[in-house]
Amino acid sequence: MENNVLYGVYSTRSRKFCFGIEEPSKTKARKELFNRIGTDAYKWRFEIRKIKRK
C-alpha cells in the first residue's frame, strides 16, 4: 500500500489541480479548500482527487 498518497482539489472546468492544496486525506483537503475560498467550494466543479506522482 502507498503511505504517501496526497489529495488535492481538481477543477473539472479547467481540467487541472488548483489552489496548490496537497493533504494526506480527503477530509483535510476539503477543509483546506473551504478555508481558502469559503462557500464557493460547494460548486460542482471542484472534486477531491488523488494526486498521482510519477
Curated annotation (Swiss-Prot):
This is SPbeta prophage-derived uncharacterized protein YoqE. It comes from Bacillus subtilis (strain 168). The lineage of its organism: Bacteria, Bacillati, Bacillota, Bacilli, Bacillales. The gene is yoqE.
